[in-house]
């Protein structure tokens, strides 16, 4: 890597760490100063990332060796390819505006210093994943992301539901990370390197072992909340809404998709097929479940799960370029939707039930305009940001597998249905509660990010697709996208138009009665099936009926063998026997005797090993 680029990446990576340390040491009680310091650093990083994105194309590397174990080298370095540059810009740009939104949203919070310090350490962690050039470095930053997200979700730790949600997210992610670390060990044992470039150059004749890809895929399943480890994401909405926008829309959950795109060459056809089927199924299921949520943030959480499934399906179809493109577009409009939800919650005095809202379009016009624009992009309205990437994935699925295309088509329809429901219940019709009746527009620090991300990038990012698509993938993606713009008979376009038409009908359907969920009233059984948390119930049964009994049995063995045989019999019996044979007790309470015993024992062990 050229010196100017290496120094640029150093600044991008370590500026947020410096901000976090400074806040932790000096600004914990100076919340306003901490907020603006963290926000200023975030905008500086975004400017540097933009400079990097617009620099000369090509893959650049920088690496320093930290340790050498035999033939194995462990180091710290950067791999800056087109995907990494794009991700650096998207993460830092979206995060900068979320920081500004947080200045207004968290204005009255007594723990602002801790909150913004957590945002900065999270930025450091996620940017480390983006630039890492090896699996071990990726894993270190991966765990830092888990730690910082735990802190941010538990910001309201005095509330039981927030504390429980943070623990749930942390534990469920550790399950996926177990597979990740086993994959790292497997890779090290078989190939002797963890460096992405060196692994890419190996290309074994017999193909990559399927187990390697399957183990590394576990990290993606946990971090990107895919089935069956998706249960933590909706509970994570217990954190402040800007956290939901940053971690659970734009960065953390997308990190798993980015990681899979980074290691796509390690995935065998069997693993790719599993990723595709799992992703498409998750997209359809999560989209339907969003129809049965009354909490605005949880509805958006299921929407995020659906889009992550679409990205996973793109990876499985062998199109990581499309997955990365959709990840970028999704970050813009989904961050806008979460920030819009935060503005609504702030304006409605912390009310989150959509059935208790309504009529906010008149009282919150800027929020409404940005939210509707992002919603249209979420629904893949032609020529908006979401359309360019989502329809390209649908087209790739149609060309590859009809079953996957059907599942993704169902997800597209569900997206339009829950989006129409959300907009209708929140912004139109009469006010359904006193909180909605007295709602007010948010301050400029909260509306400015909505205008930029919602009315700006959620709408216009699609027109800049050529600039956002990684250069190496331009020929594979840009031309089909241009062609689709003028071919209304493509399967993806037809599905998209049908979904939009059904969304328009849903908008009328949900406006029949104020403050009432029409689907629950007309189809209570179907609504109940979608609303019921099946996997949480299954995990609860497993922990209570299976795992608890296993741990009780292990505790019995520990009491019998470890505490009984090893500690009591050996620990107490051996000194007693030696004391009986020597005629004196070994425990006399004199420090010099213990020191003498330690020295003699050490000398005997040294003599034994040297004499072998």
Predicted segments — roles?
Residues 2-14, 30-36, 73-90, 128-141, ...:
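Membrane-entry segments of alpha-helical transmembrane domains in multi-pass membrane proteins
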Residues 13-28, 96, 221, 283:
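N-terminal signal-anchor/start-transfer transmembrane helix
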Residues 83, 94-138, 147-441, 445, ...:
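Hydrophobic transmembrane alpha-helices and their helix-loop junctions in integral membrane proteins
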Residues 40-54, 176-185, 374-378, 449-464, ...:
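Hydrophobic alpha-helical membrane-insertion segments
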């Amino acid at each position: 890597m050229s010196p100017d680029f290496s120094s640029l990446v150093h600044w991008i990576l370590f500026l947020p760490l410096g901000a976090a340390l400074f806040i932790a040491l000096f600004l914990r009680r100076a919340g306003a100063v901490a907020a603006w310091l963290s926000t200023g650093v975030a905008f500086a990083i975004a400017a540097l990332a933009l400079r990097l994105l617009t620099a000369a194309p090509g893959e650049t590397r920088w690496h320093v060796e930290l340790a050498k174990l035999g033939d194995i080298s462990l180091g710290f370095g950067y791999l800056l390819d087109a995907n990494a540059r794009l991700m650096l810009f998207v993460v830092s740009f979206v995060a900068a505006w979320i920081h500004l939104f947080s200045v207004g949203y968290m204005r009255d919070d007594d723990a602002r210093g801790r909150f913004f310090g957590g945002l900065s350490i999270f930025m450091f962690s996620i940017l480390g994943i983006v630039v890492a050039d090896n699996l071990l470095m990726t894993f270190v930053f991966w765990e830092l992301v888990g730690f910082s997200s735990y802190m941010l979700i538990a910001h309201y730790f005095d509330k039981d539901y927030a504390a429980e949600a943070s623990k749930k997210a942390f534990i469920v992610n550790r399950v996926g990370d177990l597979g990740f670390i086993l994959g790292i060990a497997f890779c090290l044992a078989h190939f002797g390197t963890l460096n992405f470039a060196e692994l890419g150059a190996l290309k074994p004749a017999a193909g990559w072992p399927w187990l390697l890809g399957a183990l590394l895929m576990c990290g993606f399943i946990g971090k990107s909340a895919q089935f069956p480890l998706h249960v933590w994401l909706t509970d994570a909405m217990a954190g402040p809404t800007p956290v939901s926008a940053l971690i659970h829309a734009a960065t953390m959950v997308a990190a798993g998709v980015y990681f899979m795109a980074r290691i796509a060459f390690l995935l065998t056809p069997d693993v790719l097929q599993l990723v595709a089927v799992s992703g498409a199924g998750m997209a359809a299921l999560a989209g339907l479940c969003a129809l049965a949520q009354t909490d605005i943030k949880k509805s958006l959480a299921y929407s995020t799960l659906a889009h992550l499934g679409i990205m996973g399906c793109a990876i499985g179809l062998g199109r990581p370029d499309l997955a990365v493109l959709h990840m970028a577009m999704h970050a813009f409009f989904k961050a806008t939707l979460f920030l819009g939800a935060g503005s609504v919650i702030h304006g409605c005095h912390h009310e989150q039930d959509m059935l208790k809202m309504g009529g906010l379009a008149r009282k919150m016009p800027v929020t409404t305009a940005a939210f509707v624009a992002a919603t249209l992009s979420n629904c893949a309205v032609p020529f908006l940001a979401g359309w360019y990437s989502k329809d390209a994935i649908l087209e790739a699925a149609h060309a590859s597998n009809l079953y996957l295309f059907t599942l993704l088509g169902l997800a597209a329809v569900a997206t339009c249905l829950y989006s129409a429901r959300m907009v209708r219940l929140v912004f139109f019709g009469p006010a359904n509660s006193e909180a909605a009746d007295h709602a007010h527009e948010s301050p400029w620090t909260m509306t400015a990010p909505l205008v930029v991300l919602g009315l700006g990038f959620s709408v216009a990012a699609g027109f800049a697709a050529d600039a956002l698509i990684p250069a190496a993938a331009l020929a594979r993606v840009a031309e089909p996208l241009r062609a689709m713009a003028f071919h209304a008979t493509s399967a993806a376009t037809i599905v998209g138009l049908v979904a939009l038409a059904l969304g328009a009908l849903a908008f009328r359907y949900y406006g029949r009665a104020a403050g009432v969920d029409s689907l629950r009233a007309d189809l209570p059984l179907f609504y109940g099936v979608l609303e019921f948390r099946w996997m949480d119930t299954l995990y609860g049964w497993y922990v209570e009926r299976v795992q608890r009994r296993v741990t009780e049995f292990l505790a019995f063995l520990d009491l019998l063998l470890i505490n009984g045989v090893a500690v009591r019999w050996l620990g107490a019996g051996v000194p007693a026997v030696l004391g009986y044979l020597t005629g004196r007790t070994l425990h006399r309470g004199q420090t010099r005797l213990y020191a003498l015993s330690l020295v003699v024992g050490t000398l005997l062990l040294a003599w034994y090993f040297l004499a072998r």
